[in-house]
Amino acid sequence: MTATLHVIFGPSGAGKTTYAHAFARREKAVAFILDDWMARMFGPDMPDPIEYDWMIERVQRCEAQIWSVVAGCLAAGTSVILDIGLMRRADRDRVREIAAATELPLQFHFVTASAEARRARVAERNVVKGENFAIEVTPELFDFIEGVYETPGPGELDGAIISESA
């Protein structure tokens, strides 16, 4: 079986991390969750309130390391599933370009839910701090992320696996 690069994207609070963990268990793939890496590596040093430039610099560092480890997994024949944000179409296009340049089998997974359900889920996650909690997403941060997120454009979901959570 050929190792495949599975990539999740969707708006904040849609259930992407839950989906990634379930997929990894079911398909015996390795999940790379950017929020987990950020929390473990930089959580103790995180400024309060979070500063955008501080965050972006560390996201880029984490992504570079994640891609390095992903390459090793794929070369060893192990499929991976990435949950690394990909909030903008340009970010998703960059993943397509990387996969094409390295001839990696690529499968996108689009996970979505209504804005009301996502906002409620994030608020609950902030209180419960369960398995999928990495950092607190305040209502202000949620609104900021909503403003950054770009819904899939024409043709972007062609061939994607679509999951709508309640």
For each of these PLM feature ranges, what is it?
Residues 14, 18-78, 124:
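Conserved substrate/cofactor phosphate-moiety recognition/catalytic segment
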Residues 11:
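P-loop (Walker A) phosphate-binding loop of NTP-binding proteins
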Residues 2, 98, 143-166:
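NTP-dependent small-molecule kinase module
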Residues 8:
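Hydrophobic anchor at the beta1->P-loop junction of P-loop NTPases
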Residues 57-106:
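Glycine-rich phosphate-binding loop used to anchor ATP phosphates in small-molecule kinases
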Residues 5:
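Walker A (P-loop) ATP-phosphate-binding motif of ABC ATPase nucleotide-binding domains
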Residues 100-150:
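A glycine- and Lys/Arg-enriched "phosphate-lid" helix/loop adjacent to the NTP-binding pocket
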Residues 29-31, 106-108, 157-163:
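Conserved beta-strand scaffold positions in the cores of enzyme catalytic domains, especially
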